[in-house]
C-alpha cells in the first residue's frame, strides 16, 4: 500500500541546542493538573533511545505517572535513513497509534508492507506483530501513542487500519458553523476502542466557550497555528510544536488566534468503566 503526501503542515521538535548567549526565558511548567512543554525545550539533549531500534531517537513527552496522568505514553520518534525496528515493542498488551509528520516509513504487519507519508495515521491493536523501517534518504518523524489495551470479555479487539488526515472528513461541533471541527479517525460508537486520537481544528477566532472538566486524560500536540489555552485557571499562549499534558478533570478551554487554522493532535481514554482500585 502506498499513500499520498498530505496537504497539511505539521510542526516538528525544535531539536538542536540554544547557544550559550541565549538568555533563559521559557514557558515550560509542570503543575498538579497539567504540564506544558513548549517546542523550544524539545532539544537534542533531552532525547532518548529504545531497545532494538536502530538509528532512532525520541522525545518522551508523556508517560504514566501515579496521581497524575496514568493511562498512556506519547513519543515523538525520529528515525534516520535506514533506521527502524523489527522488534518495536515487547509489551503485547499495548495498542498503538502512529501519526506521521515528516518523511516516510514502511510499516509491515499481517504480511503486508505499507508506505506511510506525512499525514498518515495507523492504528495497531494489542498483540499485533509489526515492524517499521525508513528506507529513504531523509529522516522520518512520527508521533507514537501507546496505551495498555483494556480487554473486555465478549468484546473483540479492534483491527488494524491505516488512514490519513486528508481522508477523514472533519465533523463540525453543533452551532459553530465549521469554526470548531474534529477529525475522528475511529467511529466514536465503536466500543472496541478504549482510546481515541483525533485532530481538532479551530479557525482563527474559534473557541471552546466553556471550561471542559471531565474524566478523560489528554495529550494535545499543536500541529499548526497558535492560540490561548485555559488550563486549570491559567491562560497559556500556545503555538505549533507545543505540548499540553492534562490529568483527568483538568478544566480546559481555548481561543484560536493568528491567521491560520489552530490544529492539535488529541489523545483521550474512552469507553470503559472507571477502575475501583488505586
Predicted features, each with a name:
Residues 2-25, 29-32, 210-213, 217-224, ...:
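C-terminal functional regions that serve as terminal interaction/effector modules
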Residues 113, 126-152, 248-274:
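Ligand-binding loop in jelly-roll beta-barrel domains
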Residues 2-71, 137, 146-195, 277:
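A short, N-terminal "cap"/entry segment at the start of jelly-roll beta-barrel domains
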Residues 162-219, 223-229, 235-236:
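Surface-exposed interaction/gating patches
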Amino acid at each position: 500500500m502506498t499513500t499520498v503526501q498530505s496537504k497539511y503542515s505539521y510542526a516538528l521538535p525544535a531539536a538542536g541546542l540554544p547557544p550559550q548567549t541565549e538568555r533563559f526565558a521559557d514557558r515550560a511548567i509542570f503543575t498538579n493538573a497539567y504540564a506544558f512543554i513548549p517546542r523550544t525545550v524539545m532539544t537534542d539533549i533531552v532525547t532518548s533511545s529504545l531497545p532494538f531500534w536502530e538509528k532512532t531517537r525520541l522525545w518522551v513527552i508523556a508517560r504514566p505517572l501515579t496521581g497524575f496522568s496514568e493511562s498512556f505514553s506519547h513519543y515523538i520518534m525520529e528515525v534516520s535513513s535506514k533506521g527502524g525496528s523489527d522488534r518495536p515493542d515487547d509489551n503485547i498488551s499495548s495498542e498503538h497509534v502512529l501519526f506521521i509528520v515528516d518523511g516516510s516509513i514502511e510499516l509491515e504487519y499481517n504480511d503486508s508492507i505499507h508506505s506511510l507519508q506525512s499525514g498518515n495515521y495507523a492504528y495497531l491493536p494489542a498483540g499485533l506483530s509489526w515492524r517499521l523501517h525508513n528506507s529513504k534518504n531523509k529522516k522520518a518523524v512520527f508521533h507514537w501513542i501507546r496505551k495498555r489495551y483494556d480487554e473486555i470479555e465478549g468484546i473483540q479487539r479492534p483491527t488494524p487500519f491505516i488512514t490519513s488526515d486528508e481522508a477523514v472528513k472533519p465533523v463540525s461541533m453543533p452551532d459553530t458553523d465549521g469554526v470548531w471541527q474534529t477529525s475522528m479517525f475511529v467511529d466514536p460508537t465503536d466500543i472496541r476502542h478504549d482510546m481515541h486520537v483525533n485532530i481538532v481544528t479551530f479557525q482563527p477566532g474559534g473557541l471552546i466557550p466553556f471550561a471542559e472538566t471531565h474524566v478523560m486524560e489528554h495529550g494535545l500536540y499543536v500541529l499548526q497555528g497558535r492560540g490561548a489555552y485555559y488550563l486549570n485557571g491559567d491562560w497559556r499562549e500556545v503555538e505549533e510544536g507545543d505540548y499540553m499534558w492534562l490529568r483527568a478533570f483538568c478544566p480546559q478551554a481555548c481561543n484560536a488566534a493568528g491567521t491560520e487554522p489552530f490544529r492539535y493532535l488529541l489523545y483521550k481514554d474512552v469507553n470503559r468503566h472507571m477502575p475501583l482500585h488505586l
